[in-house]
Amino acid sequence: LTEFERRHGVRVVVDTFSSNEELLAKLQGGATGYDVTVPSDFMAAIMIQQGLVAELDPTTLPNATTLEDHLQHLPFDPTHRYAIPYLWGTVGIGYDSAVVSTTPDSWAVLWDPRYTGKISMLNDQREVFGAVLRSMGASMNTKDPGLIEAAKARLLVQKPLVKAYASEHYDQLLASGDVVL
């Protein structure tokens, strides 16, 4: 950031948030002064629908045309009028191989009572529900109320096993040994 600030003659203020919902609450509460926010795709759609974001100037984004095909024309903003993909990836299970002797091959390990108090889950309801639904053999995008209730019940069973719900610094929890999954 220092080099960017020097080169462009600006001062960058970084304000982090631990979840999409926290960002949305800040914006709905009247927080201003943001030039850039980094929500997930579903939250970008909500922010666009609620008029919480300004239109982008395409002349300042020359590399937007070089995005990979699967990142072009996203459903929530197909013409990149309000949003440009910043990153894309997947969620998996990180683990301490000195404690978890068998490489996890399913989400089921996150319900193993041997790891009570040593499990960290992302503080992101979509990711967590998605993982639970996948562990049940269901689509992570299901709208079936019965499956969603079943996922909720599984999360309530898991809750006593979880040390932290963290979307920031989860890597540090694992590296320090505070959690093993």
Label for each model-derived stretch:
Residues 1-46, 172:
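Early extracytoplasmic/lumenal segment of secretory-pathway proteins
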Residues 10, 30-39, 52-53, 115-117, ...:
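Alpha-to-beta junction loops
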